[in-house]
Amino acid sequence: MKKLTILFLLISIFSCAQKAELKKEISKITERKKATVAVSVLGIDFPFQYNNNNAEKKLPMQSVFKYHIALAVLDLVDQGKLSLDQKVFIKKSELLPNTWSPIREKNPEGNFEMSISELIEYSVAMSDNVGCDVLLRLIGGPKVVHDFLISKGAKDTQIVYNEELMQSAWKNQYENYTTMK
């Protein structure tokens, strides 16, 4: 609940902030950094873009794609196809050894159940790679998330790989991308 409150607080701050002040703050944070920065905040009354030079640049999402996975899962919950209380069985073989996973640390022997709401929390709030891949398995894979995003009007966004495959080759991270458009 605390995390949800913080999220809504951040959304409120963004929606109330002045665009010029926000650009100034972003510039202050990013100046002198060797980084490609593109920020986009979309809202009914608050469209905002920073650094239009990078607007069309395909940026790897890396762990940010876990948010998109959560959206696709929650859409299936809204449709009544899944339930947040629904338990999902996690096999020991899914607890990949060389990846970040608080789930694996908590349950090293595998073969246990977690609710969808717990998997979302671990995936989004703790960036758990195992939880992410379990959610993707549950809903049918990265293509389901990609198709969901396209159906909601997302443009210039692509999700091809789960965490396991994204980490198997350096170049794969660039196939899960988005732009600020």
Predicted feature locations:
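Bacterial Sec-dependent N-terminal signal peptides
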Residues: M1-E21
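Beta-lactamase-like hydrolase cores
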Residues: A17-P60
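Soluble periplasmic/extracytoplasmic beta-strand elements of cell-envelope proteins
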Residues: A38-L42, H68, F89, V134
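Active-site SXXK
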Residues: L59-V88
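Alpha-helical scaffold elements that line and support the substrate/ligand-binding pocket
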Residues: K66-L76, L119-V145
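Acidic helix-start/capping segments at beta-turn-to-alpha-helix junctions
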Residues: L84-I103, I139-G140, N162-Q167
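Conserved catalytic neighborhood of penicillin-recognizing serine enzymes
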Residues: L95-D133
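Mid-domain, small-residue-enriched loop/turn segments at the edges of structured enzyme/sensor domains
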Residues: C132-K181
